[in-house]
């Protein structure tokens, strides 16, 4: 049994992977908390990446919700943004209440209603999630904001139009910041989202052998963060790379608050390493894994064939260029968890991929990378400062 606590953090999520990998249980159930107290940078999608890893584990069992009846279950779903994607990801499992009773049938219609509200950016809070679930070949789980006729990805121009109200919702906290910070960089945000989501469409719907993945999640989250710099530093004091990023001289509002936009993209596909090498096991060392991530970030490198294949390398390289001088990007895939601080480590096109600098997310090292239990898929979480004045 794995119990997820309401005080979950990035470090505690890493511990969940270790707990899953080392468990001697024949069947591993997961118990969800009544609420998650703080959904900070990348936390929601980090949790969902773990849950995807659990779902794919051949010992995964039941998903327990801390509710006693249907009324409580609906309220729990409506008031906690981590619940809906958890239910959909675990739909092939037993989903039970605190008494061990299967409540999946009672959750079907409330989940559809939740999806409809999400589709109109009408959920509570200042976070905007957009989920695509690959259930089967019907494409019924795809977002109309990202797909045309629920089959083809929309182009960049259409995406910008489709997501305008999503960004507007994120900007509701402060209309002035939305106008100057978000709208001033809107094309940048859309470019990042389009490139990264295109990669999930092309490389994360099938496994490394080309077989369709069901169930499978591909998702986008937009989230606004506002805190004084010292509070960000305090919050991420265990991550030297983030501390350095926050101490790099941002322009703040008159109250001393830094405004940040988080853009997170998640998929539960094979991940960079398995896809690029077409391997099913991690029979290589961590330095080689990080090298493969660099290859995926390198212009013109690709694991796919044909014209669209070439776009993969260009796309991820373009993301780094778009973030240059501004953003912070974390990449968690396979057994690696790395980052690139584009503010303190500016973009430069290198002659070979090995020269691209990536740091370990936990220890900040450029060469001594932590080996974690393998995670399914790929998570990219980006911090982008609003009202940043380029020097």
Indicate residue ranges for each PLM-predicted region.
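Helix-loop-beta hinge of the Bergerat
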Residues: 154-178, 280-303
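Short beta-strand element(s) in the Bergerat
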Residues: 259-263, 378
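Conserved ATP-binding N-box helix of the HATPase_c
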Residues: 181-254, 317-323
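Short beta-alpha junction loops
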Residues: 36, 61-74, 335-337
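Acidic ATP/Mg2+-coordinating residue in the GHKL
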Residues: 267
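Conserved short strand/loop->alpha-helix "switch" segment adjacent to the catalytic nucleotide/phosphoryl-transfer site
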Residues: 2, 36-42, 168-194
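Short, glycine-/small-residue-enriched flexible loop/hinge segments at domain edges that mediate gating
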Residues: 26-40
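Flexible, glycine-/charge-rich segments associated with ATP-binding catalytic modules
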Residues: 1-25, 56, 81-100, 105-137, ...
């Amino acid at each position: 049994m794995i119990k997820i606590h309401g005080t979950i953090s990035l470090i505690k999520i890493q511990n969940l992977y270790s707990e899953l990998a080392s468990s001697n249980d024949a069947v591993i159930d997961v118990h969800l908390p009544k609420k998650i107290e703080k959904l900070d940078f990348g936390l929601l999608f980090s949790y969902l990446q773990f849950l995807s890893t659990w779902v794919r584990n051949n010992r995964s069992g039941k998903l327990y919700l801390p509710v006693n009846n249907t009324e409580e279950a609906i309220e729990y779903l409506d008031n906690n943004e981590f619940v809906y994607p958890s239910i959909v990801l675990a739909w092939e499992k037993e989903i039970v209440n605190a008494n061990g009773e299967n409540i999946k049938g009672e959750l079907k219609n409330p989940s559809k209603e939740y999806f409809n509200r999400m589709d109109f950016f009408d959920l509570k809070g200042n976070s905007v999630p957009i989920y695509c679930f690959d259930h089967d070949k019907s494409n019924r789980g795809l977002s109309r904001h990202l797909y045309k006729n629920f089959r083809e990805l929309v182009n960049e121009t259409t995406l910008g139009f489709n997501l305008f109200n999503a960004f507007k919702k994120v900007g509701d906290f402060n209309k002035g910041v939305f106008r100057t910070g978000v709208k001033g960089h809107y094309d940048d945000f859309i470019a990042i989202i389009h490139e990264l989501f295109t990669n999930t469409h092309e490389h994360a719907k099938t496994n490394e052998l080309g077989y369709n993945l069901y169930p499978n999640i591909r998702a986008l989250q937009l989230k606004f963060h506002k805190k004084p710099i010292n509070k960000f530093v305090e919050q991420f004091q265990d991550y030297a790379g983030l501390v350095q990023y926050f101490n790099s001289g941002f322009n703040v509002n008159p109250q001393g608050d830094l405004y940040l936009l988080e853009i997170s993209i998640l998929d539960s596909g094979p991940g960079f390493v398995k896809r690029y090498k077409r391997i099913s096991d991690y029979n290589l060392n961590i330095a080689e894994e990080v090298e493969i991530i660099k290859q995926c970030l390198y212009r013109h490198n690709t694991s796919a064939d044909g014209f669209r294949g070439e776009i993969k390398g260009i796309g991820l390289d373009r993301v780094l260029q778009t973030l240059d001088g501004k953003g912070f990007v974390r990449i968690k895939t396979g057994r690696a968890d790395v980052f690139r601080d584009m503010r303190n480590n500016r973009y430069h096109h290198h002659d070979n991929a090995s020269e691209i600098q990536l740091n370990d997310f936990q220890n900040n090292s450029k060469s001594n990378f932590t080996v974690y239990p393998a995670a399914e898929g790929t998570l990219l979480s980006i911090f982008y400062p609003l009202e940043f004045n380029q020097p």
